[in-house]
Swiss-Prot record:
HAMAP family: Rel_fac_1 (MF_00093). It is found in: Cytoplasm. Belongs to the prokaryotic/mitochondrial release factor family. The keyword Cytoplasm applies. This is Peptide chain release factor 1. NCBIfam families: prfA, PRK00591.1.
Length: 361
């Protein structure tokens, strides 16, 4: 193990011991807020400590076995020492690999819920139908994760699906699993209205944003907002409400426009629209920070129209993620079984982080 990494682990080990002692003091035991904060901090480094302790224990056994090999003349003891050295060396190598991954920098947004926006792009009616298919795919995946889905804003399309839909998924570490979904999703299939059996290509853009909680303050100057109200409408612009309950908010400095019409009241729609706006502004700043960093970790796309990340090929029952050259059967994925591709993307993220760490040394 490199000296720099070993020293870092020793510091974490000492911090763990200090926090454990602090947690048992009367001052902390009588302060529930501080107690929970320290307990959470301990939990965040417990796995690192457990693996590092195994590393230290096996390192000691290895050194003892090497000493026996040098000092002893007994053939039986020497043979046992050789077996011990081989076993401990293998264990230590595995612990080092695991610690390398555990020590990788964490994304501060990984624990957050998400707001997902899907828009029809190229392809007209077929693109809007595809938006509906993607929404169902994410909804089914969320159900499998015991996560909750709430539609925040939607615009129904005449031929089916949505021209746009914005929804929230709440659950355990949802952003960490869906942050790589941003980008252009392309579908290739024969539309139901196609009489000649020709394959059409359509696209939809997906943007995944961390949901901003109350702890994060996003400063928005009221004078930077233009707020319009209008009657909510259904597919094809048909009015479905007799009052101006729908809300459109324009953030003038960034040009971001958000709408909400699914709530019954104007107050409810304004609250939802402001929540979406805050997440969009936060996500915009997040993208700026990522652009300033190195070329690593480009998996989390910006959602730009030019950034094609995935193709859903129905005639060939094939899904391809172009960023990692990953192909698999389309049917399970479109039915919500996203975990194989999520796991492949997470594995690639870890690889890129390790490469980045070495590049920075």
């Amino acid at each position: 193990m490199e000296k720099k990494m070993f020293n870092s682990l020793m510091k974490i080990h000492q911090k763990y011991q200090d926090l454990k002692q602090l947690l048992e003091t009367d001052q902390i035991l009588n302060d529930q807020k501080q107690y929970l904060q320290i307990a959470k901090e301990i939990a965040s480094i417990t796995e690192i400590i457990e693996v590092f302790q195994k590393f230290l224990d096996d390192q000691k056994v290895l050194e003892d076995a090497k000493t026996i090999l040098i000092q002893e003349d007994d053939p039986e003891l020497i043979q046992l020492a050789k077996v011990e050295i081989a076993t401990m060396s293998k264990n230590i190598e595995e612990y080092e690999k695991k610690l390398l991954i555990l020590m990788l920098p964490k994304d501060k947004n990984d624990e957050k819920d998400v707001i997902v926006e899907i828009r029809g792009a190229a392809g007209g009616d077929e693109a809007n139908i595809f938006v509906g298919d993607l929404f169902k795919m994410y909804h089914k995946w969320a159900d499998s994760q015991k996560a909750k889905v709430k539609v925040l804003s939607s615009s129904l399309a005449l031929a089916g699906g949505f021209s746009q839909i914005i929804f929230q998924i709440s659950g355990q570490k949802i952003y960490s699993k869906l942050k790589f979904e941003s980008g252009v999703h392309r579908v290739q299939r024969v539309p139901a209205t196609e009489t000649m059996g020709r394959i059409h290509t359509s696209t939809a853009t997906v943007t995944v944003m961390p949901k901003i909680d109350e702890k994060i303050e996003i400063e928005i100057n009221p004078s930077d907002l233009k707020i319009d109200t209008y009657r909510s409408s259904g597919a094809g612009g048909q009015s479905v409400n007799t009052t101006d309950s729908a809300v459109r908010i324009t953030h003038i400095p960034t040009g971001i426009v958000v709408t909400s019409q699914d709530e019954r009241s104007q107050i409810g729609n304004k609250e939802i629209a402001m929540g979406i706006l805050k997440s969009k502004i936060y996500n915009l700043e997040l993208q700026k920070q990522q652009q300033k960093q190195s070329d690593f970790r480009k998996l989390a796309g910006s959602g730009a129209r030019s950034e094609k990340i995935r193709t859903y090929n129905y005639p060939q029952d094939r899904l391809t993620d172009h960023r990692i050259n990953f192909s698999t059967s389309l049917k399970p994925i479109i039915q919500g079984s996203l975990n194989p591709i999520i796991e492949a993307l997470l594995a690639q993220e870890k690889t890129e982080l390790i490469l980045q760490n070495y590049a920075n040394k």
